[in-house]
């Protein structure tokens, strides 16, 4: 099932010659190549998103995949698994922020196909460095500190590549929580445009 926040799950009933068939709303949207990331990012969420992208690639390797993102972020390694798959699959990956894309959510937003990274007008985007903590013997703390530093450098380097910002600016801006409006995110290079109210029903059509 597409990944979204828990709560009542609407169903859609379709009629055919073989009778009525009910779909949960996210499965129905998956048929339109729309995926939702509406939770924090962990291994289970990453597995679900990766599986959906691979399925949609197998269905049609030339048609865009759309990922709607409303996520506070989460596990860096799980997020990188999603990111690597976004870069690997043949279809272009359209990313659309609705609500909030923070931390790993913002990173995934920026990792969509260039020219196809979008945000709704009242969305918020926040970037910062990876969070982590360690306890135990000094050698264990040192190992964890090195890993956090490695992940920070990896994420900053990739974000610099996707935004066009200098690496030192990315490092400085992500030292603390850094919030942006959609217009500011366009200027920063995190996204490419803000979705207007064109009455297209929320489906981002291919240009």
Curated annotation (Swiss-Prot):
Source organism superkingdom: Bacteria
A GO biological-process term: protein quality control for misfolded or incompletely synthesized proteins
Record keywords: Cytoplasm, Hydrolase, Protease, Serine protease
Protein name (record): ATP-dependent Clp protease proteolytic subunit 1
Any one GO cellular component localisation term in the record: cytoplasm
NCBIfam families (alphabetical): clpP (TIGR00493), PRK00277.1 (NF001368), PRK12553.1 (NF009205)
Family annotation (PANTHER family): ATP-DEPENDENT CLP PROTEASE PROTEOLYTIC SUBUNIT (PTHR10381:SF70)
Chemical reaction(s) catalysed: Hydrolysis of proteins to small peptides in the presence of ATP and magnesium. alpha-casein is the usual test substrate. In the absence of ATP, only oligopeptides shorter than five residues are hydrolyzed (such as succinyl-Leu-Tyr-|-NHMec, and Leu-Tyr-Leu-|-Tyr-Trp, in which cleavage of the -Tyr-|-Leu- and -Tyr-|-Trp bonds also occurs)
Function: Cleaves peptides in various proteins in a process that requires ATP hydrolysis. Has a chymotrypsin-like activity. Plays a major role in the degradation of misfolded proteins.
A single GO molecular function term of this UniProt record: serine-type endopeptidase activity
Catalytic residue positions: 103, 128
EC nos: 3.4.21.92
Organism placement in taxonomy: Bacteria, Bacillati, Cyanobacteriota, Cyanophyceae, Synechococcales
Similarity comment: family membership: Belongs to the peptidase S14 family.
Location of the protein in the cell: Cytoplasm
Subunit structure and binding partners: Fourteen ClpP subunits assemble into 2 heptameric rings which stack back to back to give a disk-like structure with a central cavity, resembling the structure of eukaryotic proteasomes.
Keyword match Transmembrane helix: no
Main location: cytoplasm
Pfam family name, one: CLP_protease
Broad EC category: hydrolase
